[in-house]
Amino acid sequence: MSLLTEVETYVLSIVPSGPLKAEIAQRLEDVFAGKNTDLEALMEWLKTRPILSPLTKGILGFVFTLTVPSERGLQRRRFVQNALNGNGDPNNMDRAVKLYRKLKREITFHGAKEIALSYSAGALASCMGLIYNRMGAVTTEVAFGLVCATCEQIADSQHRSHRQMVTTTNPLIRHENRMVLASTTAKAMEQMAGSSEQAAEAMEVASQARQMVQAMRAIGTHPRSSAGLKDDLLENLQAYQKRMGVQMQRFK
């Protein structure tokens, strides 16, 4: 796996699923391929994206700044600086300075990542802030190691939270989660459908599913009534893909 592929993997792991994630993935690919060289326009685009947390925007802004060649005097962006200040906690800043001193002596991506993984996400973000604000300088490889360690810390906590929700025994939470997943799957089906005859059928199935979820929410239904909703939709989607000659793995 190449360095940039690894960076892209880690960064995308902290971006919520949805159309925006696909858009961000495309921007990262373009940036890493040297196709997008207007850093200012890229940062303006990032700043106005909805849904993303300030920290995720800060990390993406840091990655774009590291990768896209820019004029020396280009102003640092406030939204990135604010996101990478470790919540203003002086303890985070102290740890960030200690980490920075270690990273300065490091020259490899994996070495930097290994060192950084023993620090909290707050300290890692603060250390990125130091580098972003030009208070410290490390090699691009080392900076990417720091980015990936930060993303790993964030993804770990997101995974723990997600696992808690998936394994919860609360029937109301499970019911709502199934309906949200069914609704999201229906939306994906509509986006994939295109304009063929079979597409009309897929659109109809997706539309009915969304209406059913809306009705279930409006009138209130038994927590078990949503069981199998997403699976039924996915079976329909796979049948549609087969007719269209598209072979895709299940994405349950």
From Swiss-Prot:
InterPro entries: Flu_matrix_M1 (IPR036039), Flu_matrix_M1_C (IPR013188), Flu_matrix_M1_N (IPR001561), Flu_matrix_M1_N_sub1 (IPR015423), Flu_matrix_M1_N_sub2 (IPR015799), INFV_M1 (IPR037533). Residues 165-252 are annotated as: RNP-binding. It is found in: Virion membrane; Host nucleus. Its main location: virion. GO terms for biological process: viral budding from plasma membrane. The keyword Membrane applies. SMART domains: Flu_M1_C. Residues 1-164 are annotated as: Membrane-binding. Keywords: Host nucleus, Membrane, RNA-binding, Viral matrix protein, Virion. GO terms for cellular component: host cell nucleus; membrane; virion membrane. It holds the Pfam family Flu_M1_C. It is a peripheral membrane protein. Homodimer and homomultimer. Interacts with NEP. Binds ribonucleocapsid by both interacting with genomic RNA and NP protein. May interact with HA and NA. Cannot bind NP without genomic RNA. Most abundant protein in virion. When expressed alone can form virus-like particles in transfected cells. Belongs to the influenza viruses Matrix protein M1 family. This is Matrix protein 1. It comes from Influenza A virus (strain A/Fort Warren/1/1950 H1N1). The lineage of its organism: Viruses, Riboviria, Orthornavirae, Negarnaviricota, Polyploviricotina.
